[in-house]
């Protein structure tokens, strides 16, 4: 189940706030400019849907977001435990970084942990099926897909070139809980 855990940036073992309630999560994250919402497909996706089927099932929600925010492109990414690059990709995503654009992800299946470094706190957002998160441009963050990743997500971009990271060099991510 989706969850938000908040730590101070100086204490990585004891949370100062925790909730699994989507409305509470959306309110707490929204106060920091982070969008969190739940989407539903407009059809059954079946087993192992292709990217076109995934996009089609959520096109209504994508169109609403594009109309509101002016995003330019979207795609589907899937990661599985048998991916030969999983360790290198996990390591890269675990380094704190920022983007010059919003990082928008919608989880079609599976899970991932977004960790946001905001105002002296670390907001760990466990995103699961039907969760959308939009991390504002310039927000220091990292992402953990776990040691045996399993997720499919829709990525939505401001920039036609897609995901461009600027790594901060801050090792803070090393001290916080990760997915198994």
Swiss-Prot record:
Ni(2+) binds at residues 97, 99, 103, 141. CDD domains: cupin_ARD. It is an enzyme of class 1 (oxidoreductase). GO terms for molecular function: acireductone dioxygenase (Ni2+-requiring) activity; acireductone dioxygenase [iron(II)-requiring] activity; iron ion binding; nickel cation binding. Binds 1 Fe(2+) cation per monomer. Its cofactor is Fe(2+); Ni(2+). Fe(2+) binds at residues 97, 99, 103, 141. The keyword Cell cycle does not apply. The record marks 105 as: Important to generate the dianion. Belongs to the acireductone dioxygenase (ARD) family. This is Acireductone dioxygenase. It comes from Erwinia tasmaniensis (strain DSM 17950 / CFBP 7177 / CIP 109463 / NCPPB 4357 / Et1/99).
